[in-house]
Regions:
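A domain-level signal for caspase-like cysteine endopeptidase catalytic cores
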Residues: 160-167
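Short His-Asn-centered micro-motif
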Residues: 128-130, 150-151
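Catalytic cores of soluble, metal-dependent hydrolases
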Residues: 2-34, 40, 46-48, 52-125, ...
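Acidic, His- and aromatic-enriched active-site or binding-groove loops in soluble protein domains
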Residues: 144-155
């Protein structure tokens, strides 16, 4: 089913992520979570439609704005709902809208300036996209940043990889929970900015129906949620969502890939804002980590 051209009934009016407030970048404060959209295509992608990802994720997020709409807290699994206090979410979550279309150089310059300013202000950028073609631009806005990548193709051996797509280069091994957590703690340098790339391909094949790069194996939803919750407890400067192509056939009006990404992203948001988080989360299953 193609992405609806008109908003769903609950989305009348201005469409923002989880119905968050709109802000100008000059009004971003320390501790804010700042949503920004990248409605662009990867020219090397096998299918067109990645530019629709930012809108699709915003549409889906409306159903997760349970601080305003408690009956729609978790459309994937109602049992996954956590009873936590989210006082202050509306004040700290904001949406800047999308980067405007234009020449590649102008897009990259605008994005780099925006991410750099958000990071300098002590806020965290949530970048909604389908294409990962601008991920290097995001990295360049945060000099000497470390990158943690969930899914996707490994590009740098120095990055921390969770369930990467096989490319014939990375060495992938099975590690127990304690070793995984120890490796993340050893890898993380708190003096450097932290960039998280969250690609839809991190999910197991049966779940990633809207992904242009299907894969064998992968994580279930609970495991991805736990990883993002764990990463969110670090001072992440930016997280970028990639790999989503809403034009591919999916399941239902609010498609499965969109629901998975927003469900998992909520764990990151709550952890980053320190909502109901008293200690580091622990993973309960084995997972693939590239070393």
């Amino acid at each position: 089913m193609p992405l609806r051209s008109a908003p769903l009934p609950r989305m009348a009016g201005h469409l923002s992520f989880m119905r968050s407030q709109s802000k100008e970048i000059c009004d971003v404060k320390s501790g804010d979570l700042v949503v920004i959209g990248l409605p662009f295509e990867d020219t090397n992608a096998p299918h067109a439609g990645q530019s629709l990802a930012s809108r699709a994720l915003r549409e889906t997020s409306v159903y997760f704005g349970w601080h305003a709409n408690p009956q729609f807290s978790h459309p994937v699994d109602i049992d996954a709902r956590q009873d936590i206090q989210t006082d202050g979410l509306h004040e700290r979550l904001c949406d800047l809208g999308d980067i405007s279309l234009g020449p590649d150089e102008a897009i990259q310059a605008t994005l780099k300036a925006a991410i750099s300013q958000i990071s300098r202000n002590g806020a965290c950028a949530i970048i909604l996209g389908g294409s990962d073609s601008l991920s290097e631009t995001v990295q360049s806005a945060m000099p000497k940043c470390q990158t943690a990548q969930l899914g996707g193709i490994p590009r740098d051996a120095r990055d921390f990889h969770v369930a990467p797509l096989p490319n014939g280069c990375a060495t992938t091994c099975k590690l127990e929970t304690a070793a995984q957590l120890a490796r993340l703690s050893q890898w993380r340098d708190a003096s450097k900015p932290l960039f998280v790339r969250f690609d839809l391909s991190v999910f197991e094949t049966s779940l990633s129906a809207l992904c242009d790069q299907p894969r064998l194996g992968g994580c279930d939803l609970d495991t991805v949620v736990q990883w993002l919750e764990l990463l969110g407890q670090h001072e992440v400067n930016a997280i970028m969502l990639t790999g989503l192509n809403p034009s591919r056939p999916g399941m239902g009006v609010v498609k499965v890939g969109q629901r998975l990404m927003v469900t998992a992203l909520l764990a990151f948001i709550y952890a980053r804002l320190r909502f109901g988080i008293d200690h580091l989360g622990c993973l309960t299953s084995k997972e693939e980590v590239s070393t």
